Amino acid sequence: DALPILFGEKQKGEAGESVVSLPLSSLHSFKRHPFRVPDDEKMEETVKSVRQYGILVPAIVREDKAQGNYEIIAGHRRKRACELTGLSEMPAIVRELTDDEAVIIMVDSNIQREDILPSEKAWAYRMKMEALSHQGVKGEAYTADLVGEAAGDCARTVQRYVRLTYLNPKLLDFADHGKVSLAVAEKLSFLSGEEQGWVLKTLGGNVAVLSKSQAEALKEESENESLTEKCVADIINREVKRISITISAKKIKDYFPQDYTKDQMEEVIFELLESWKERMCQDS
């Protein structure tokens, strides 16, 4: 086996922890692991790296005495890469962790990935918030702030993502595929399961037509306990007046160098809008 040659039967981790080589058959996924492990292009790159260099960063696992094996805390993609490479073992650090400690490590080791779906981020944030709450961190806003700090999101954004975990699975799937915005999905999450079912029935799969104002109207009717199936249909089928904003080049040209092209101006404007949105998020 290539791994014992690369790592030896036992090495030391960065903090003096022992690194051991464990059979892949003795490793199982983290309970309620919210992240996908797809066989995509990035996995192909990981497999190539494993073939060339081996596993450079050991997985983190904990002993599962009930099953007589180990639960992966961090390293699900590395394990899959080892399987695809044909290896039978992989290096790992075995730690004694509580359920809450394990959740926090699991989330933090995955949350910075670029290809995370809204549903994955939503469940990861919720799991970490619950874990921190169990550890004595008080206050939803403060807990959300701690969770967001590790992921580069503000507390309000974290709370909005957590709301997605209360969505009908079909509506959550729409959010994953970009058919509904985070703002609309958040509003719909306050509806009961039955009410969300009415929304799906009325939309017939065409959820992209639902605007934020319509979603807000649905939420308000639900909170007032006056939302019926007919009311859902009336709100969704209501024609919404679209807002269109046009800014003439004459009004903004003085803010840019004379040699700036239209595309360069647009790029600067959108960068400024993104900065403004981030500040608004932090203040909310």
Residue ranges and their predicted role:
Residues 80-166, 190:
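Amphipathic, charge-rich alpha-helical segments that serve as recognition/docking helices
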Residues 123-131, 145-146, 155-278:
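Amphipathic alpha-helical extensions and coiled-coil-like segments
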Residues 51, 83, 149, 175-176:
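Short polybasic/polar patches that bind polyanions
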Residues 1-95, 106-112:
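Short, charged/polar connector segments at secondary-structure boundaries
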Residues 23, 39-42, 46, 69, ...:
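Helical mechanochemical/support elements of P-loop NTPase systems and associated helical scaffolds
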